[in-house]
Amino acid sequence: RDLNTVLNKIATYATMDRETAEDCFYVLRRKDANGNDNTIEGLSIRMAEIIAGAWGNLRVQTRIIGNDGRKITAQAVCHDLETNFAVCKTVDRRITTKTGKTYSDDMQVVTGNAASSIAFRNAVLAVIPKAVTKRVINEVKKVALGQAIDVETSRKNCLANFAKAGVTEAMICQY
């Protein structure tokens, strides 16, 4: 595995445009026990999918392993076939309201899918070392926050510079 190639793929996919870069992160607002607002943020399932695809030689599987009427349990296994390192992660999600009423069948499916996605993300991020991806993740975050140029903007700037020299997009494509 060539780490430079992996990191370049992650950066290319995740910074295609600002919207894609934004999809690589999640932010949740929650109240703590004292009623104070807390912000929870991290890498999204989309970023985990991009990292897993770029990493290569990786097998990831998710499945629902339990539904006891109160919670759904999802499990994900991620196996790096090059290093033979594997991780199994489980995620529980409640399927009852605050008053104890069980979610509809439809909402249980949605909750199960969400739990599977979270388990997938957790397993992938446990197998692929953060030390390897930290730098590129920071670059993606800059694009998401509008502090860096995404691939599409970079392409437009490049074409504009060529146009100043009399080179058209058609000429570039033909070349």
Question: Each predicted region: which residue ranges?
Answer:
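Polyanion-binding surfaces on beta-sheet-dominated domains and ring/shell assemblies
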Residues: R1-I72, V77-Y175
